[in-house]
């Protein structure tokens, strides 16, 4: 793994302790190769360090574009209109180890982990009267949550990965750490979430980690682990909080007209469009809108979204340009101030629907599915049995998150990659470890089949 020295500006509009609106980050320079003693020594530097963790999460290599593109391009909703053969590898479900996208994502995620590790290691030792116990716990809890999310994202792309829990001070420090199993990697995710939860406040914040953000990731985590009861339990915690979270209508309300931080959002990443830029719009928008349209909805997705019985209000996700070409319109703000959506309440409804279906609670699961359909201005769906309900949920997730990076991961985790994607080689369900990492660290082993 490479240790990268980075300076990102990430502005917050109000102080770290407030939890009611988007908070813009102050200047952040959390160096990963300087003396540890100079990094976090008081309240100000502790706040700076946690901002640096969020800035790494928002980076273009992670939720800013690259990591999410793995989910988009590997599914069956998007076509690549550009000329780079490496991007087409995702569409073809045949990604090579020298693919620059996976290398960029790997480095960005481990950079995020390293910054979180720095906070986790140093903030508990800070003695500053201005750094209250509550604020100290919050900062540490946020770092644990983000590290949990990072390892979760690593596990679902690469399987088992090296588990690094101490901050990197020089680029060679993490050389020689072997990969853990996928089970051990997911165990690290849960351990970090269990640590984060009691440290975090119970307030609602759509841009910072709280207990509620932990519940959202726990619900998704347990879905991947097939622990249906736990997945249902944590989804229900958020759905029950209807004062703060609800399926807002019409469907486009959570993103259209420059909306951000709506009641639809459980956790989204803020970009101001100047010092923090979300590069998604450049890939989705057309040339006349200042983009490249290199990611575009394919014909099957366009048909599904534009058919009233299946797409409903979700047809707002796509639009036509002056050349009669369809393009994705979830990310449209210029210059690049769209949020990145990490958790929406719609996902929690569909997670609970799936968990309930697996538990044999067909009517309750169908009610959750139909809540999402109703918000999309669709007629209620029907399902006579568990299998029918699971298939209906799968189809709904494809359209509800048509331009969000869920589809590939959904189909792989449910064991339907052969049926849906015609991918029969299970080695292809995870991606190769980037060749640059293998060359620099002989302790790393490649995934089978690559």
Segments predicted by a language model, with ranges:
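Acidic, glycine-rich segments characteristic of secretory precursors and extracytoplasmic regions
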Residues: 2-4, 18, 22-71, 443-450
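Bacterial Sec-type N-terminal signal peptides, specifically the leucine/valine-rich hydrophobic h-region
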Residues: 16-19, 151
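Hydrophobic-face positions in mid-chain alpha helices that act as interaction patches
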Residues: 78, 84-87, 230-345, 415, ...
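Conserved, well-structured interaction surfaces
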Residues: 47, 85-158, 195-204, 335-340, ...
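Short, surface-exposed recognition loops and adjoining beta-strand edges that mediate ligand/DNA contacts
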Residues: 36-37, 64-85, 161-165, 201-281, ...
């Amino acid at each position: 793994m490479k240790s990268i020295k980075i300076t990102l500006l990430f502005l917050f509009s109000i102080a770290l302790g407030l939890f009611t609106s988007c908070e813009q980050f102050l200047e952040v320079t959390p160096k990963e190769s300087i003396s540890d003693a100079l990094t976090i020594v008081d309240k100000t530097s502790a706040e700076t360090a946690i901002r640096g963790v969020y800035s790494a999460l928002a980076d273009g290599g992670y939720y800013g574009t690259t990591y999410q593109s793995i989910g988009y391009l590997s599914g069956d909703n998007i076509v690549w209109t550009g000329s780079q053969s490496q991007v087409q590898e995702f569409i073809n479900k045949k990604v090579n180890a020298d693919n620059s996208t996976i290398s960029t994502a790997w480095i960005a995620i481990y950079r995020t982990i390293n910054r979180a590790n720095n906070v986790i290691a140093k903030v508990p030792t800070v003695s500053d009267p201005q750094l209250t116990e509550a604020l100290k716990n919050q900062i540490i809890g946020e770092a644990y949550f983000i590290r949990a999310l990072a390892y979760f994202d690593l596990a679902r792309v690469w399987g088992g990965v090296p588990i690094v829990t101490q901050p990197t001070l020089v680029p060679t420090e993490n050389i020689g750490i072997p990969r853990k199993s996928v089970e051990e990697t997911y165990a690290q995710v849960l351990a970090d979430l269990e640590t984060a939860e009691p440290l975090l406040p119970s307030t609602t914040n759509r841009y910072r980690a709280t207990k509620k953000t932990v519940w959202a990731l726990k619900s998704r985590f347990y879905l991947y682990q097939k622990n249906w009861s736990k997945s249902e339990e944590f989804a229900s915690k958020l759905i029950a909080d209807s004062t703060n979270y609800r399926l807002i209508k019409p469907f486009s309300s959570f993103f259209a007209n420059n909306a951000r931080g709506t009641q639809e959002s459980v956790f989204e990443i803020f970009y101001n469009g100047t010092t923090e830029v979300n590069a998604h719009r450049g890939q989705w928008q057309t040339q006349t809108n200042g983009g490249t349209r290199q990611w575009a909805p394919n014909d099957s997705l366009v048909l599904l979204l534009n058919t009233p019985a299946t797409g409903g209000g979700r047809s707002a996700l796509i639009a036509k340009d002056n050349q009669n070409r369809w393009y994705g319109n979830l990310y449209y703000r210029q210059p690049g101030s769209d949020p990145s959506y990490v958790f929406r309440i719609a996902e929690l409804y569909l997670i609970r629907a799936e968990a309930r279906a697996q538990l044999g609670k067909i009517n309750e699961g169908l009610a959750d599915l139909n809540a999402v359909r109703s918000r999309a201005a669709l007629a209620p769906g029907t399902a006579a049995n568990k299998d029918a309900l699971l298939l209906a949920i799968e189809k709904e997730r494809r359209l509800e998150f048509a331009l969000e990076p869920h589809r590939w991961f959904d189909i792989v985790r449910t064991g339907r990659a052969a049926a849906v994607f015609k991918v029969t080689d299970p080695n292809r369900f995870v991606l190769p470890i980037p060749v640059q990492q293998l060359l620099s660290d002989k302790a790393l082993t490649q995934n089978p089949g690559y």
